[in-house]
């Protein structure tokens, strides 16, 4: 097989979205390299997508960009690829973390999926006083992250961190990173913005001068943060309290809304 594969229609060459399957594989990628497929990826290509030997796929590993590849062999026992040309150089996503209090399983999965699609670099479950469910099925969430990245043209996977108590997170917080605290109304809605008890600014306004500074978004549990947690958060210099509008949002909706606002204000949607 020649090192170059003629793969028309790839984004970045003709500007047209390719219809070739796209896979994340945890292996080095270079022209002519052999790339083994996991059992799950082989099943997906051969049995779901109905691809066979000689067919073209796109692959990425989060380090070496995106490459075209051909299915070199396919059988019931598995499949393997031969890597061709690089179709896109490696690009990162903005330095944005999403931190959220775990909710019910399907909602947590939705948050993780949408955070991947919307370009979060780090996803971290945070256990608060009112967190209703702190069970995290990391293997299942990693599979969701992989599939979402494959479908949305990401060139990397966000880091999924293990869950940690909010108190520990705040104690070890990096000084250079802003924490965008989604606190809908504050304790006193008539008080001036900011301080220990005032309401937060609308998120887009609060982020207007943030620029490219590293940031994290904190989404609370369905029951909200406790008074002690909110007081602690508002006492920290690196915390920016914000509101997401006049309506009370579900946790998963708040995460999607906050990520969208941040990307359009400070991220790679600009």
Give the positions of each predicted feature.
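N-terminal positively charged helical leader segments and presequences
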Residues: 1-89
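Structural motif
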Residues: 22, 34, 56, 78-80, ...
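RNA substrate-binding interface of SAM-dependent RNA methyltransferases
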Residues: 86-185
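Short gly/pro/ser/thr-enriched loop/turn and capping motifs at secondary-structure boundaries
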Residues: 131-133, 188, 248-251
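Active-site/ligand-binding-proximal alpha/beta "capping" segment
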Residues: 179-232, 236-243
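Structured adenosyl-cofactor binding patch, chiefly the S-adenosyl-L-methionine
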Residues: 227-270
């Amino acid at each position: 097989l020649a090192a170059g594969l003629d793969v028309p229609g790839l984004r970045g060459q003709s500007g047209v979205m390719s219809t070739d399957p796209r896979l994340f594989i945890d292996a080095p990628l270079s022209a002519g390299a052999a790339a083994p497929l996991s059992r799950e990826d082989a099943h997906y290509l051969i049995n779901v997508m109905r691809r066979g030997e000689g067919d073209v796929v796109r692959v990425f590993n989060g380090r070496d960009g995106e490459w075209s590849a051909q299915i070199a062999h396919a059988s019931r026992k598995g499949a393997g690829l031969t890597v061709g040309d690089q179709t896109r150089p490696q690009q990162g996503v903005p330095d944005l973390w999403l931190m959220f209090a775990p909710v019910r399983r399907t909602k947590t999965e939705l948050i993780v999926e949408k955070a991947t699609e919307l370009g979060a670099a780090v996803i971290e479950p945070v256990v608060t006083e009112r967190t209703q469910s702190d069970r995290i099925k990391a293997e299942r969430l990693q599979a969701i992250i992989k599939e979402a990245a494959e479908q949305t043209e990401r060139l990397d996977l966000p880091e999924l961190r293990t869950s940690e108590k909010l108190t520990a997170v705040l104690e070890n917080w990096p000084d250079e990173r802003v924490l965008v605290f989604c606190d809908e109304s504050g304790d006193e809605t008539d008080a001036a913005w900011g301080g220990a008890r005032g309401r937060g600014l609308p998120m887009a306004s609060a982020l207007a001068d943030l620029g490219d500074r590293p940031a994290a978004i904190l989404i609370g549990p369905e029951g909200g943060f406790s008074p002690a947690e909110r007081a602690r958060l508002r006492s920290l210099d690196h915390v920016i309290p914000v509101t997401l509008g006049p309506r009370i949002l579900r946790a998963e909706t708040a995460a999607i809304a906050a990520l969208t606002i941040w990307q359009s204000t400070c991220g790679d949607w600009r």
